[in-house]
Design a protein with these regions (language model features):
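Short, Lys/Arg-enriched N-terminal segments with co-localized hydrophobic residues
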Residues: 30-50
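Targeting/processing segments of secretory and organellar proteins
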Residues: 17-18, 23, 32-35
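Alpha-helical and His/Cys-centered functional microenvironments
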Residues: 7, 15, 294-296
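Leucine-biased recognition of intrinsically disordered, low-complexity hydrophobic segments
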Residues: 7-10, 19, 25, 40, ...
Length: 492
């Protein structure tokens, strides 16, 4: 079926519009079937059979669950979730050929004169949205974005991650990640944060709205096929964390985007505002996205070595060394907002200095202690990212840095188990401990010089991202803040 559809579109692609097998007319610029090489269309019968099976499963689930609308989700370059809805009658056609849309108003996408885009849903991401009514139900699918000629759109962050993962796959590796996304509940979003509770780290607060919010959020995530390991109250008042089960990086990036929306939707349902802003409250801990990660070769954890004193393989050590070496230049991707750098300061358990350790949580990279019989759990934890990053781009640059370490055979420096925040500057210098960028401008300037980041993101996203962040910094630099008014107005 898929083959005949492609050939039919090929036959009619000489006309001003491209008529698909299902009778849907694409824009004149849509030449995907015409320009694709023959061997790409007919890769293998097995691949087509798998795609047809996925499509059939989606159509079956949609029918069984009385689905009437499907939301196609994707992100802009900043990781802001975008999407549009199609009716169930359009679902089969969307799975086969994608859906056309105008990308000119989406951050980092195309100009208005070249804005025709195709969103093709990934059938593996089909899930019913639980907070919508079961009658005339709504489902969601993540979509990959394509150019009118059928090639992957270089401004699509999901494609950037898929390309990075393909590079790892070509070397025999699969990246698994487990991010810890922290967030705050506030009473409203009116610009004056008001705590919902006064609990602290691991506190069992009374049965209040925050406890119920977390419970309902977890049940909603589980209903969408996203497995939760545990949840708890974090250090700051009204700060919470729900940890998702370790899985492959693409699935986790999709899950992270879903998680952020679910947290906000459930909060909104109860008249509460949830935020992933890195540092919403002065004098309190900010919210991080500590990212646990490891490489697997088949079912074997490539990071594990039973003979090493740290139970880390040479691959793991080189990967970690790559993360450490390139951490400064990827920081603008993993901590992408002006506000991110209010979190990355001493005194609030967020990393500032570039080092690694096992027990020391002031280090940038931490290796959780090995437990006998848990070889597959061997991993490293990268502690600087925050939950407001774009997970597709963040996972991509982390992986690129780690693979560069493996490729070049970087040597991992000795661990630093002392509290780096208590060290003198001379002591840090003696240990060769550098620091992360102190603000967004410094981070962007380092990224701008990075061949690794440019190569990973591709020229389009790299340039658009740099441009966007320079504008953000200029807006911040020229803004007269409340701090300045309170400090200077009475005395100057």
């Amino acid at each position: 079926m898929a083959t005949s559809g492609m050939l039919f579109a090929l036959q009619f692609s000489k006309y001003k519009g491209v008529l698909s097998r299902r009778g849907r007319l694409f824009p004149e610029s849509y030449t995907g079937f015409k320009k694709r090489p023959f061997f790409l269309i007919f890769i293998s019968l097995k691949k087509e059979e798998e795609m047809d099976k996925d499509k059939e499963n989606v159509l079956k689930m949609a029918k069984e669950n009385d689905v009437k609308f499907i939301r196609l989700w994707f992100t802009d370059i900043l990781g802001i979730l975008k999407g549009f809805a199609i009716t169930v009658d359009e679902l089969e056609g969307a799975l086969e050929e994608g859906m056309g849309f105008d990308g000119s108003s989406i951050q980092g996408y195309a100009r208005i004169d070249e804005s025709d885009m195709i969103a093709k849903p990934d059938p593996k991401t089909f899930q019913i949205i639980p907070w919508r009514p079961k009658e005339n139900a709504v489902a969601r699918m993540f979509a990959d974005i394509y150019e009118p000629d059928g090639t992957p759109y270089k401004g699509d962050p999901r494609w950037v991650l898929k390309r990075a993962l393909k590079k790892a796959q070509d070397q025999g590796y699969t990246l698994y990640v487990g991010p810890e996304l922290e967030y705050f509940y506030f009473k409203s979003s009116d610009g004056v944060p008001q705590f919902l509770d006064r609990g602290g780290y691991f506190d069992l607060t009374p049965l209040d709205v925050a406890t119920e919010l977390r419970r309902e959020t977890i049940l909603t995530l589980e209903a969408m096929g996203i497995h939760v390991e545990y949840s708890h109250h974090e250090v700051a008042p009204s700060q919470h964390e729900i940890d998702l089960r370790y899985t492959d990086a693409l699935t986790m990036a999709d899950n992270a985007m879903t998680y952020r929306l679910v947290v906000k939707e459930i909060a909104l349902k109860h008249g509460v505002y949830a935020t992933f802003m890195p540092k919403p409250i002065f004098g309190q801990n900010g919210s991080g996205m500590h990212t646990h990660q490891s490489l697997f070769k088949g079912n074997r954890n490539a990071f594990f070595d039973p003979k090493d004193e740290f139970h880390l393989s040479k691959i793991a050590k080189s990967y970690m060394a790559g993360i450490l070496k390139h951490s400064k230049e990827i920081t603008s991707i993993t901590s992408q907002w002006v506000n991110s750098y209010k979190r990355l300061v001493p005194g609030y358990e967020a990393p500032v200095y570039i080092s690694w350790a096992r027990r020391n949580r002031s280090a940038l990279v931490r290796v959780p202690m090995y437990k006998p019989g848990k070889e597959k759990a061997t991993r490293m934890e990268f502690r600087s990212p925050d939950p407001a990053c774009n997970p597709y781009l963040a996972f991509a640059v982390m992986l690129a840095a780690g693979l560069k370490g493996i490729e070049k055979g970087y040597e991992l420096p000795p661990p630093v188990e002392e509290d780096i925040f208590e060290m003198s500057e001379a002591s840090r210098k003696k240990h060769g401990i550098d620091s992360l960028p102190g603000n967004l401008l410094e981070a962007i300037q380092l990224t701008e010089k990075s061949e690794l980041v440019r190569e990973t993101l591709g020229d389009h996203i790299f340039q658009k991202f740099i441009e966007n962040k320079k504008i953000e910094w200029y807006q911040y630099r020229t803004h007269v803040s409340q701090f300045e008014l309170e400090k200077y107005l009475p005395i100057l």
